[in-house]
A protein has these predicted regions:
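RNA-binding accessory domains that recognize and position tRNA/RNA substrates
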Residues: 1-210, 214-215, 229
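Conserved beta-strand segments of alpha/beta enzyme cores
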Residues: 109, 199-201, 265, 290, ...
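Hydrophobic residues at beta-strand termini and immediately following loops
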Residues: 181, 203, 269, 313, ...
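Cysteine-nucleophile active-site neighborhood
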Residues: 218-219, 224-290, 296-301
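Short, Gly/Ser/Thr-enriched beta-strand-loop segments that form substrate-interacting elements
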Residues: 307-315
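Short, surface-exposed beta-strand/loop micro-motifs that present aromatic residues
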Residues: 319-325
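Conserved small/polar residues in nucleotide/adenosyl-binding loops
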Residues: 328-330
Length: 330
């Protein structure tokens, strides 16, 4: 390959030629897009993006650099990163590094100087699909062979890969004693729970219902996370056993696992919801709320049991954004 050049090859054969960005190497993942103009550091470190190559639709990325505070986990979680153009000289009083240096240091492969609008439209029209970025190999046949071996996101349990392996306490003070199940939990979610007077103990994804009952929390929180919710069988079974015994609140993957435990079904969205301005209608109040979202699967509204109420709807595609079963505090 030419010096500093890179290629993105999609599973359907579409290719994009650009420049290397970050670490020199090769990476495979599901190619998706995020429509946020800011928040790239949070996106890079969000465990929900495990095994995904993220495309930023905003054309200029890295303006305010990288700092030590705006992380959602202890490391970069994405498999790769795609942008139109990198900011070479970031400007912010908290900035400690450029985004390119940050990716290089953490050995994350990226590509820039491609038509990200065309890529986004291709994903929008054809759906999220696997792709490979390489700054080492430009042979299409070779890259295609590697790509065909990559698993589909359907049926993939990734929660166990990103979850904590040990129980730990996030906050020791608070009125409400909460057990948070870590399927890929973000730091900001833990901070928000703590800010709302919750004493939080974080448990691994494969924690059993017996362990939660023994801990005896006042409520159980099911976190966000990557992969197919239907593949997290251990999580679904754990929630089934807790239904009616403890108040349960789920977000993102946790919301989907909770819905599956209640008897609903989930399905893969064509290209997912990833951005910071998704309109969601609160069906109780009629108010439209602007939300930040990051998920590739959704709950099938038609599969909800009769006793489960749909409380929130995504107005972009009329998919489920919230459910409630008030009789057992769900």
């Amino acid at each position: 390959m030419k010096k500093n050049s890179a290629i993105l090859l999609l599973d359907d054969g579409r290719k994009f030629i650009g420049k290397s960005f970050g670490f020199i190497g090769e990476t495979i993942g599901e190619v998706c897009f995020n429509t946020g103009m800011t928040g790239y550091q949070e996106i890079l470190t969000d465990p929900s993006y495990c095994k995904q190559i993220v495309t930023m639709t905003s054309p200029h990325i890295g303006n305010y650099g990288i700092n030590e505070e705006d992380v959602e986990s202890k490391k970069i979680q994405v498999s790769g990163f795609i942008i139109k153009e990198e900011t070479l000289i970031p400007s912010n009083w908290r900035s400690a590094a450029s985004i390119g240096d940050y990716l290089t240091k953490n050995k994350i492969v990226g590509i820039q100087q491609i038509d990200t609008r065309a890529l986004t439209r291709h994903i929008r029209d054809n759906g999220a699909m696997n792709g490979i970025i390489s700054s080492l190999d430009s042979n299409i046949k070779s890259l295609s062979g590697k790509l065909k071996k990559a698993p589909s996101m359907n049926g993939l349990d990734l929660a166990k890969n990103v979850s904590t392996k040990k129980v730990y306490q996030w906050s020791s003070k608070g009125k409400y004693n909460v057990a948070a199940i870590d399927y890929g939990i973000k730091h900001n979610i833990l901070k928000l729970l703590a800010d709302n007077n919750c004493k939080i103990t974080v448990f691994p994804a494969k924690t059993t219902a017996e362990e939660i009952i023994e801990f005896n929390p006042q409520g159980v929180f099911l976190s966000n996370g990557p992969g197919d919710p239907a593949a997290v069988a251990y999580g679904i079974e754990m929630v089934k056993e807790l239904l009616g015994k403890k108040p349960i609140f789920g977000i993102c993957l946790g919301h989907q696992i909770l819905s599956l435990a209640l008897g609903a079904k989930t399905f893969k969205l064509k290209f997912g919801h990833r951005g910071i301005n998704h309109p969601v209608k609160n069906m109780n109040s009629g108010i439209v709320e602007i939300t930040s979202q990051n998920h590739g699967f959704a709950v099938d509204l038609n599969s909800l049991p009769k006793n489960v109420k749909s409380t929130h709807i995504n107005l972009n595609d009329n998919t489920s954004a919230g459910i409630e079963l008030s009789l057992i505090h769900i």
